[in-house]
UniProtKB/Swiss-Prot annotation:
Top EC class for this record: lyase
Function field: Terpene cyclase that cyclizes farnesyl diphosphate (FPP) to drim-8-ene diphosphate used by vviA as the native prenyl donor to catalyze the prenylation of D-mannitol on C-3'-OH to afford sporulositol A.
Catalytic activity from the UniProt record: (2E,6E)-farnesyl diphosphate = (S,S)-drim-8-en-11-yl diphosphate
Domain of life (superkingdom): Eukaryota
Protein name from the UniProt record: Terpene cyclase vviB
Bias (Basic and acidic residues) ranges: 323-333
Organism (species): Viridothelium virens (Speckled blister lichen)
Family: Belongs to the HAD-like hydrolase superfamily.
Region of interest: Disordered: 312-333
Amino acid sequence: MLNLTNVDDALHKGEEWLETNKKTFLSETETGISFKDNFADLLLLELSNRWDYPVIVPEDYPEDNDTNAVAFSILKPTDSRAKVLIDEILACKNADGIVQVHLDPNRPRIAPEVSANILSLFYSYGRGHEVQESLSYLQKAMALEEYQESRYYFLPEPLFFYTWRLLCIASGSALETIDNQRLPKELHTLRDHLIRRVSARLGTAKDNALCPALRILICHSLGIKNDVDLQLLLDLQEDDGSFGRAWFEGLDPSSARLHERGLHAARKTENNPRPPSDMQQRIHDPQMQYARWSDWPLAPSIARNDKGIQHDHHTLGSLESPRPSHDLLLLHH
């Protein structure tokens, strides 16, 4: 049986670690190159509701539909500004009607994780009916018994998380809640797939704290008892309150793995003051372009593209480079 005192202590230690390390969550390669990842920062912002934890980084967003979709579903700019982006995304459908990963039509790639994030954006603006082909593609991926590793992800939990996030948004609920009464009927099958897939993964990936953390979030909102993953997290917490290194995604095209300590610590704790009103005003400032956040604090950023992983205009890898015999480990600290 779980000791609730241990759970409370773990939450307190995790919150202290987040507070102590706010604005310092950097990615780092094993060769010592550090960078900020805006995609992880956006998810950290949504989960913690703390504007002072991440630094929302890029002077320009990377040219991919995934990051833009996540950003706009979290930051909620004006409807007119969002319409411009949504219309651009709609122009990126492939021959099957599935929205592609990149804004560039010369990069014809799709991924179920990206489809889930794009669907979240469209449903948040009442336009889910325009991307039903992407929904069908996501449902087929979730219907599988085994996870099919993709170019961008190597574990099923990120797919589960993005799907769960879609269900929360589409039902008009706050994150961490799925309102089954308001959930659109076309998403009921997707919800059932999520319940089945997550239930089958309980207690797995014992060396990656992010996996049980995501499953706990999902199970809580779906009414699934999950003490086994909670115990896993308690066992994985380190003395400083963090939860160690937890791999989250791969960096196309090098198959390098990404880890964000701040992001997965936030997924295990709750600390939710409201963002300051002046930041909300800046989001809705008519002078602010939809893909530009130049008035926000800037930090080195990476751009994920097929020409290589860019950092401060220096290429770290390229599509033509042979795949290394072992993964290049990219560690967010």
